[in-house]
Amino acid sequence: MNTPSNITLSKDKKLLTVTFDDTDYPMTSEYLRVYSPSAEVQGHGPGQETLQLDKQDVTIQTLIPMGNYAIAIHYSDGHTTGIYSWTYLYKLGSKNHELWLNYSNRVKEKDSNKNYHKVQ
């Protein structure tokens, strides 16, 4: 199990860089927020995930160490229940492109399935 050697939050609080094995994994606050491991986002089982929308302006307010295994991240939108294990942060960092593409496609699919009704 890898433990990060460094965790850095940018001054604007929109970019968290986590270093594992001399490799930096920069992740935006939006990306981390929409992939929060909390039950509020992930649900309590497969298929219960809640698509997080309009999180592009969210910033990271606080990073809280959770023993030697994780950090809790508190966000500017009030979300405070995500505890990011080192394993989960490594997954988010190493699969950033793939996971962001998946999220973007789900948002596009949701937008294309909207029914717009003209109000008369």
Show which residues each predicted segment covers.
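Motif-centric detector for short Cys/His coordination patterns
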Residues: 1-120
